């Protein structure tokens, strides 16, 4: 289990104060969901309680990506390489990442590509932790992502849009524990 706390202010009305508040309430690992482009942001996220940060490979040149990856690791944080194409996944692997998140939402148009994870995940080594971001709204979606190799999913939209957040969360968590879920085998 992991909590992804949205701290990006402009599109999601999140803040580091929100993450600090969540950090006080739970002991689960937390990822600071923001667009990280500067080492200062990594230090800031760590100070506010983040255990991990996302690095969006598609908007960073290779040198910047690797420098931010090194900075996160030097602070004892996990860096999640967020990719949208097989080429971005290759760049992340060349840098030596251990966690790759395939984001099904396009960065520029905010369109959903429901096949992104199924297209990219098979090319990732088995030792890499694979996360599916976006497109998981139902227990069936979760099981489909797991059958394509997902070790974890981010289902924020489904949970936050639900009339009953607790029920939606329980439904997805139960699906992840179901014997039919390939990750449970």
Where does each model-flagged region fall?
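N-terminal active-site wall of soluble small-molecule enzyme domains
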Residues: 1-80, 88-91, 99, 117-120
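Catalytic core of soluble alpha/beta enzymes
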Residues: 84-129, 135-145, 162-163
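C-terminal helical cap(s) of enzyme catalytic domains, especially alpha/beta-barrels
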Residues: 114, 119-123, 146, 160-185
């Amino acid at each position: 289990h992991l909590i992804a706390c949205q701290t990006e202010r402009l599109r999601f009305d999140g803040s580091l104060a929100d993450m600090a508040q969540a950090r006080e309430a739970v002991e689960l690992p937390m990822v600071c969901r923001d667009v990280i482009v500067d080492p200062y942001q990594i230090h800031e996220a760590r100070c506010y309680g983040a255990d991990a940060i996302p690095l969006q490979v598609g908007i960073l040149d290779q040198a910047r990506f690797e420098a931010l990856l090194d900075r996160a690791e030097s602070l004892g944080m996990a860096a999640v390489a967020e990719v949208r194409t097989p080429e971005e996944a290759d760049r992340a692997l060349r840098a030596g990442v251990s966690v790759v998140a395939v984001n099904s939402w396009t960065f520029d148009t905010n369109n959903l590509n429901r096949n992104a994870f199924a297209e990219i995940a098979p090319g990732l080594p088995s030792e890499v932790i694979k996360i599916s971001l976006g497109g998981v709204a139902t227990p069936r979606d979760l099981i489909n992502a797991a059958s394509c190799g997902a070790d974890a999913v981010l289902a924020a939209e489904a949970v936050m849009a639900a009339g009953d957040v607790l029920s939606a969360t329980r439904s997805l968590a139960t699906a992840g524990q179901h014997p039919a879920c390939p990750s449970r085998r």
